[in-house]
């Protein structure tokens, strides 16, 4: 296993929106920062699950696309030379006798003076389509994540699922794809009423109550066999792409073994955002305290609190209260 012997000031576990802002703010406090992210890209759930959806509750933006928000956060962070480690899941964390944290991932060993975990609801994985050969099509035209809607331009797309994500993707694909079908095992969808109304008023082919029973194709899925849930009807759908929206399963996983105080699947923090382990902080949806509200906006406020207190932990002479950003950047 590789080892990065450099000891960073702050290691951020989780590269979602709160993690990105944490890394930026660490740079503002002149700390060396490393981000460790388990996914292949930064942005967390915003990039992985709904990059094309709009967010309406971020201060200063009447609305902003999820991926655009991530891109802005990355641009903001890029003012500083932060180290990014992708596709690495932290498995163990140990505070050594010298006070330095040793973090072991599935690929590498890292060292840090402090840790700020911003891992959202923990690691998340999509619920898979459980059909023979489904896994073999994941690298071609069976999708659990969508990064660019335009890749489906002029194509026949089948969306599997009945929740908000499935309905939203079907509606967003309608003006782009050649043909969109949504397949759900029940007659009624579990999505927002307004979205369901829009779906039924759209040109999307609604197929209910049917389930996929077979995927036909060699290198790519060419057809899906659909069978009625309570009945004998069967139909075959020609497709170019299949998008699966059966939801996601999130778990704290190994985080529970790190000696942190956990309450209802969240890490308990003080008003400084410090956990029960000195030098180990948490921000965003993964942490909890009295009156906690799980919003991106809340996480953006918790990140500077964690960074400023981490700075004071590393250097007791440092001010917890920082200078205003205008002063910092004008002096550069």
Curated annotation (Swiss-Prot):
This is Ferredoxin--NADP reductase 2. Belongs to the ferredoxin--NADP reductase type 2 family. Pfam families: Pyr_redox_2. FAD binds at residues 37, 45, 50, 90, 124, 285, 326. It is an enzyme of class 1 (oxidoreductase). Homodimer. SUPFAM superfamilies: FAD/NAD(P)-binding domain. GO terms for molecular function: ferredoxin-NADP+ reductase activity; flavin adenine dinucleotide binding; NADP binding. It catalyses: 2 reduced [2Fe-2S]-[ferredoxin] + NADP(+) + H(+) = 2 oxidized [2Fe-2S]-[ferredoxin] + NADPH. Binds 1 FAD per subunit. Keywords: FAD, Flavoprotein, NADP, Oxidoreductase. Its cofactor is FAD. Its EC number is 1.18.1.2.
